[in-house]
Amino acid sequence: MELVIKDVPSLLSVSEIIFGRDFNEALIHQVVVAYSASTRQGTRAQKSRADVSGSGRKPWRQKGTGRARAGSFRSPIWRSGGVTFASKPQSHSQKINKKMYRGALKSIFSELIRQKRLIIFEKFSLDLPKTNLLVKKLKEIKLNNVLILTKEIENNLFLASRNLYSVDVKDVCSMDPVSLIAFEHIIITVAALKKVEEMLS
């Protein structure tokens, strides 16, 4: 299949097997959920009755006081006692094998091409790391909510985009399924697209 290059009047030939896949919503959903779960810190922690500091002595004898029986100062029903079902640090990561991950990326790129959300440039860079230069460049092509993918990180582009909420710059090795779905348009250079094709083949 052939794709149009925006800044140069020519076509780029790419693999139909990689960029002509059907939209597999279930697979993409599974991969996106797994990716999002793996970014969770999972470091929250609370103290159970075993972790709270305090005496292990029985507060008062079992019978004869007229008060409700009590066995510990650290009981969850007492003030300053432990939490009943205390949270502990845990990993939320889910296993996704390489074949599934690559399949999801192929499906996402194929859908981006079908929806004309993938815009290819021969070269996309800035002479200076200035935010207003990037804003002006994006206004010229009438785009605002954009992920810019390059073969290797363009320092000027990266620095210019840091203050823009709706623009992100990544190199191909750092791309992820969540970012590819989240942005309205993806700007990608020819070199980056060839690298994506090589990675997914």
UniProtKB/Swiss-Prot annotation:
Residues 44-68 are annotated as: Disordered. InterPro entries: Ribosomal_uL4, Ribosomal_uL4-like, Ribosomal_uL4_dom_sf. GO terms for biological process: translation. GO terms for molecular function: rRNA binding; structural constituent of ribosome. It comes from the Bacteria. One of its GO terms (cellular component) is ribosome. Keywords: Ribonucleoprotein, Ribosomal protein, RNA-binding, rRNA-binding. Transmembrane segments: none annotated. One of the primary rRNA binding proteins, this protein initially binds near the 5'-end of the 23S rRNA. It is important during the early stages of 50S assembly. It makes multiple contacts with different domains of the 23S rRNA in the assembled 50S subunit and ribosome. Part of the 50S ribosomal subunit. Belongs to the universal ribosomal protein uL4 family. This is Large ribosomal subunit protein uL4.
